[in-house]
Regions:
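Conserved SAM-binding loop of SAM-dependent methyltransferases across substrates and taxa
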Residues: 1-8
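Conserved SAM-binding loop
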Residues: 25-26
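A short acidic, Gly/Pro-enriched loop at the edge of an enzyme's catalytic core
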Residues: 45-56
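A short SAM/SAH-binding and catalytic strip from SAM-dependent methyltransferases
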Residues: 54-70
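A short glycine-rich, Lys/Arg-flanked "PGG" loop and its adjoining helix->strand segment in the class I
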Residues: 72-84
Length: 131
């Protein structure tokens, strides 16, 4: 869907934990950058692209399966790679934001509920403070 909206494939970086699914993504989308590894260790997973900055991000790890400290670290790491105010869209499968807002650091707002996702998902938008 992202590519259908006109994003140049060479600008898209995807992080996938599963080696087999990462291989499948590379076959299906040869022009995008697929990084196989752990999003919770983004610096290591990005390798040569470790200093990469994002215009925005879409994140879908099942955060509610992880300790709060790990969730906060992931959200903070992603937001630190973006300009203040740019959106981080996080999929989640619970009724509440997987990481609450942090005054002075980031805000969170409920964006949408996606029934077509299996299981149905809520979308949350996180933004770094300071804009």
């Amino acid at each position: 869907a992202i590519l259908e909206r006109g994003l140049q494939p060479g600008l898209l970086h995807a992080v996938e934990y599963s080696a087999s699914f990462a291989s499948e993504l590379r076959l299906r989308f040869p022009s995008i950058h697929v990084h196989q590894g752990d999003a919770f260790s983004l610096q290591e997973t990005l390798g040569a692209h470790a200093d990469l900055r994002f215009d925005c991000a879409v994140s879908a790890p099942p955060l509610l399966n992880f300790p709060v400290a790990m969730r906060e670290t992931l959200i903070g790491d992603l937001l630190s790679r973006m300009s203040p105010g740019r959106p981080l869209i996080q999929f989640s499968y619970g009724p509440f934001a997987p990481v609450p807002g942090r005054a002075g650091q980031w805000s969170v707002e409920r964006y949408d509920f996606v029934l077509r996702n299996m299981p149905p998902a809520r979308l949350w938008i996180y933004r770094q403070s300071g804009h």
